Design a protein with these regions (language model features):
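N-terminal intrinsically disordered, cationic/polar leader segments
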Residues: 1-93, 100-103, 107-149
């Protein structure tokens, strides 16, 4: 079985706006992207997660985005199926760091107890070694953005 070990992570970029004027509930949209690039020897990989949250009225009242990169060492990768397993493991290990950054931003801006919903990454749905479909092509290769529902 292939295993990923988080070696280090860093916040690459953060954007935040809070122009809420009154207390109460607000409807939010959330989207994320996640991809993993493997070294040719299969012993290392870099995972990249981007998450954004904004108000459903266009993001002018509330917007937060965090871009986090993690470096992993990998054991037992022998093929594409192993890479799919590691892909899911990298997300599971990197998500809590990204979640903490967004929680701290929200807490500091007067929105306590904010929680993002963690996606379930099914290894069977992971594409290995293929570019995204034309309609999913990111504006910038280093920061793709795809919506989730």
């Amino acid at each position: 079985m292939a295993i990923a070990h988080l070696v280090t992570q860093k916040v690459q970029e953060v954007h935040f706006t809070n122009k809420l004027t009154e207390q109460g509930q607000i409807q939010l949209d959330s989207s994320f992207t996640f991809h993993v690039n493997f070294a040719k020897d299969g012993k290392r990989c870099i995972a990249h997660i981007y998450q954004s949250v904004k108000d459903k009225e266009g993001g002018e009242k509330l917007f937060a985005s965090v871009d986090v990169i993690g470096a992993f060492s990998c054991d037992g990768i022998e093929g594409d199926e192993d890479k799919k397993q590691v892909h899911a493991q990298c997300y599971d290990q990197l998500f809590p760091y990204m979640q903490t950054v967004i929680q701290n931003l929200m807490q500091a801006s007067g929105i306590p107890g904010f929680q993002l919903r963690k996606a379930v990454i099914n290894p069977e749905n992971v594409r290995v070694g293929s570019a995204p479909a034309a309609e999913e092509q990111p504006a910038e290769p280093s920061q793709p953005r795809f919506p989730i529902v």
